């Protein structure tokens, strides 16, 4: 899922999650992977919830995978776990726009709405923006296929709606899955997250950590004969 902080305490929680992930990072298929464990979320956010909001992410997320597998019992358990850890009102089901032939995203969007109504978990809409506007689609496609071998990937279908939308464009795209009343709910809940963000500065003076007191020691000069040589 995705994590977003809305106050300074949340920033420090994300710092700690990031530090833990980097400490266990490893290389896989040419990329450095930095996994965050569920236990990290429980220990850092679960101990003091209310400073970070979580959402269920795109089709690559765990919850959409469970939905596409038809495992709704496990999906509900996962949602309940998220609500427990992040706190009531701090976990969101996340819909995204798609084209009419994207059956997986349509299935997930409709299932998420049903779960929203059944479990009373708030629902939002996001755009997994990889480029600025729709007119930049071909440039983005060329970039994806520019590596050696001409890998065409899934640039046309997968990234067709992966750009920033105007409200009107987004509403039109969402009509594939939702009616106007549902879209109003999606927009309103998404804006409520932005309204919760506090204004604060990350600019700080340099903070030098205090070192522990070192035990006293005596220099024995065991290598003194080599001082002048090396």
PLM regions: where:
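Phosphodiester-processing cores and adjacent nucleic acid-binding clamps
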Residues: 1-230
């Amino acid at each position: 899922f995705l994590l977003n902080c809305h106050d300074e305490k949340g920033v420090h929680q994300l710092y700690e999650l990031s530090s833990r992930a980097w400490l266990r990072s490893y290389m896989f298929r040419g990329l450095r992977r930095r996994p965050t464990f569920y236990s990290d979320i429980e220990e850092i956010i679960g101990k003091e919830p209310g400073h970070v909001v979580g959402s269920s992410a795109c089709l690559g997320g765990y919850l959409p995978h469970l939905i596409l597998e038809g495992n709704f019992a496990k999906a509900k358990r996962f949602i309940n776990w998220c609500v427990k850890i992040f706190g009531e009102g701090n976990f969101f089901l996340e819909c995204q726009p798609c084209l009419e032939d994207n059956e997986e995203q349509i299935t997930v969007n409709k299932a998420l709405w049903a779960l929203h109504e059944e479990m009373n978990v708030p629902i939002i809409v996001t755009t997994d923006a990889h480029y600025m506007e729709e007119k930049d689609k071909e440039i983005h496609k060329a970039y994806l296929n520019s590596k050696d071998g001409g890998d065409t990937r899934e640039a046309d279908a997968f990234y067709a709606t992966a750009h920033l939308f105007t409200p009107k464009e987004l509403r039109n795209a969402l009509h594939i899955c939702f009616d106007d009343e549902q879209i109003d709910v999606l927009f309103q809940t998404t804006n409520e997250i932005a309204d919760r963000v506090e204004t604060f500065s990350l600019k700080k003076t340099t903070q030098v950590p205090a070192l522990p007191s070192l035990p006293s020691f005596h220099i024995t000069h065991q290598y003194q004969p080599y001082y002048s040589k090396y």
